């Protein structure tokens, strides 16, 4: 939600509102592009005769680069400004989607052996992880620059809800159109959409605030080490752990449904698309309705989210039919909506104005860490020890995060900062 008028901010609320709406649309487009893969890849892999572990490798390849590069892009946005980095990330995302579409077409048409097609898909996701990862930390820092401490958690919740909105549309669009037009044409359309967003950012996103820290040297290892700063460390640990839970559930859900309900690949696409859409709807409801109504501190949001993750994973352990599986996944997604807004808002509040880009990069990198570990690990557990094992491990991890949220003093301290009087905001 854009902040009210502040005489210290000459841009006024209307210009900020338009800027935030544009960022919302851009992140929603990238959310569509990312979430559709969780509906498309499991049935595509089975059509190509590729083992589940190779699907996990695609996610992990992208996630490793996302993990290491997000802090760098966040720091670069402090140096060169938010808008150029947002535009660059969107452009690279569009290009990576085009490459993925070509690889999928080559694999399905028989022009490339299945493992070569999977390798090309992994290369495309490498481009996204390394370069497309510039968008999220830069957009998050853009919003943090223009909101007070008291407003920031809610404002960042609205921004991250954009990605969740895309997560609703991605599986739904995939389920509706992939069977009709094919994987490659559908992904080309998504690439065009994201490319149009990059053009819109170049032409329409205002940025009057000069970059801070222009003399700071960008050392990738130093930016990554910023995660160990004692102000940020508890939020980074919580975020990485929660992203592992989320990445595990996203990776496994398609295979879990096909196993439990004895579905063929086409049915798996339809059923998983509906489940993913329902979960994303719960995430959006948490971020756009529940969080503004609660006006809770980051600590409370983190605790509530972790508690929901415990309940959701336990539900999946005993789910006996499609409705029960969807219900468990909805609980997991609702909890993630609360927790993600809590740890991103808390990390932003824990540091000063000149460190917002770096903090945004570090918290964004937790997604990369989660997806670097969880997909391969979850699918290994799935194949080796049974389909409920990933949910059992996630339930234990969520219980640990629940304790961290309520017991760590740094999380409590950052939550107290949100109660101070709003500070003047910088111009757009």
What are these language model-derived features?
Residues 28, 110-134, 324-338:
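Hydrophobic core of transmembrane alpha-helices in multi-pass small-molecule transporters
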Residues 91-114, 308-320:
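C-terminal ends and interior cores of transmembrane alpha-helices
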Residues 39-53, 251-271:
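Short amphipathic helix-loop junctions that connect adjacent transmembrane helices
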Residues 66-68, 271-294:
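Transmembrane alpha-helices of Major Facilitator/SLC transporters
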Residues 67-108:
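Conserved MFS/SLC helix-loop-helix module at the cytosolic interface between two early adjacent transmembrane helices
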Residues 124-163:
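Cytoplasmic helix-loop-helix junction between adjacent transmembrane helices
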Residues 2-17, 206-236, 423-428:
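Juxtamembrane intracellular "pre-TM" segments in multi-pass secondary transporters
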Residues 298-343:
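C-terminal transmembrane helical hairpin of 12-TM major facilitator-type secondary transporters
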């Amino acid at each position: 939600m854009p902040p009210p008028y502040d005489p210290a901010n000459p841009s006024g609320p209307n210009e900020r509102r338009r800027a935030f709406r544009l960022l919302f649309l851009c992140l929603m487009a990238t959310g569509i592009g990312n979430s559709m893969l969780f509906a498309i890849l499991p049935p595509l892999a089975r059509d190509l005769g590729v083992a589940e572990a190779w699907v996990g490798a695609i996610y992990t390849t992208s996630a490793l680069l996302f993990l290491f590069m997000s802090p760098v892009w966040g720091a670069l946005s402090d140096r060169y400004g938010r808008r150029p980095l947002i535009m660059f990330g969107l452009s690279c995302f569009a290009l990576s989607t085009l490459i993925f579409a070509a690889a999928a077409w080559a694999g399905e048409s028989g022009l490339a052996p299945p493992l070569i097609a999977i390798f090309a898909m992994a290369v495309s996701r490498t481009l996204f992880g390394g370069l497309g990862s510039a968008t999220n930390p830069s957009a998050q820092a853009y919003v943090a620059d223009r909101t007070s401490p008291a407003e920031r958690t809610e404002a960042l919740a609205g921004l991250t809800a954009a990605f969740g909105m895309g997560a609703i549309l991605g599986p739904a669009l995939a389920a509706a159109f992939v069977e009709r037009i094919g994987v490659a044409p559908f992904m080309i359309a998504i690439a065009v959409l994201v490319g149009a967003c990059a053009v819109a950012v170049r032409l329409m996103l205002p940025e009057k605030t000069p970059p801070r820290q222009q003399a700071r040297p960008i050392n990738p290892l130093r930016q990554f080490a910023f995660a160990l700063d004692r102000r940020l460390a508890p939020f980074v640990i919580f975020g990485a752990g929660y992203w592992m839970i989320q990445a595990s559930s996203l990776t496994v859900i398609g295979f879990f449904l096909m196993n439990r309900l004895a579905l063929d690949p086409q049915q798996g696409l339809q059923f998983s698309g509906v489940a993913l859409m329902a979960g994303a709807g719960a995430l959006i409801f948490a971020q756009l309705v529940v969080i503004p109504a609660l006006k809770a501190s980051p600590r409370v949001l983190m605790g509530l989210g972790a508690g929901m993750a415990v309940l959701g994973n336990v539900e999946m352990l005993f789910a006996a039919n499609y409705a029960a599986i969807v219900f468990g996944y909805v609980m997991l997604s609702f909890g993630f909506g609360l927790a993600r807004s809590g740890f991103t808002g808390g990390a932003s509040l824990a540091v000063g104005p000149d460190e917002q880009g770096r903090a945004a990069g570090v918290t964004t990198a937790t997604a990369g860490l989660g997806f670097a570990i969880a997909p391969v690990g979850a699918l290994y557990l799935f194949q080796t020890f049974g389909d409920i094992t990933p949910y059992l491990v996630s339930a234990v991890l969520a219980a640990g995060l629940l304790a961290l949220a309520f017991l760590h003093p740094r999380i409590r301290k950052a939550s107290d900062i949100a109660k101070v009087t709003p500070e003047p905001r910088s111009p757009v």
